[in-house]
């Protein structure tokens, strides 16, 4: 696992301090976005889906999907120079809010006090039951020779 070449995005005219983070240990993006972006000591994770990175399979049920999503989140965090205990904000998306308690029981296994700020919302998810995005502190810096 590694940060994707820690290169700026000059073709998009973006700030060179925005560093895309990518790992094959989490679900590949389903569209034109990064798994995460590191910027100024923060790591911004895109919505992580419950897709197994090796098989591409989506597990059945809220509990299994919650574990899959949170494993993907942990892998992206680690790749981006962070960890679960450095997460400051989480947004959890549930296809059905009646699944809140089941999701929450799994979520507790992957976090500890002081818990990050969190919002849980009902969302129209395409073929999945759970998705999660997060913001965390990180240690990723631009590669040598890149502007800071």
Predicted stretch roles:
Residues 1-71, 75-88, 94-148:
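N-terminal presequence-like segments and the immediate start of the first folded domain
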């Amino acid at each position: 696992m590694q940060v994707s070449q820690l290169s700026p995005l000059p073709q998009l005219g973006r700030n060179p301090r925005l560093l895309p983070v990518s790992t094959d240990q989490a679900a590949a993006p389903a569209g034109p976005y990064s798994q995460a972006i590191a910027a100024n000591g923060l790591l911004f994770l895109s919505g992580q889906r419950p897709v197994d990175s090796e098989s591409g399979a989506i597990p059945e049920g809220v509990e299994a999907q919650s574990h899959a999503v949170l494993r993907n989140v942990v892998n992206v965090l680690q790749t981006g120079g962070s960890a679960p205990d450095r997460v400051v904000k989480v947004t959890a998306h549930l296809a059905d809010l009646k699944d809140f308690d089941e999701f929450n029981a799994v979520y507790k296994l992957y976090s500890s006090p002081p818990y990050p700020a969190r919002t849980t919302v009902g969302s129209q998810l395409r073929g999945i039951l759970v998705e999660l995005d997060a913001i965390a502190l990180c240690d990723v810096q631009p590669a040598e020779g890149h502007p800071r």
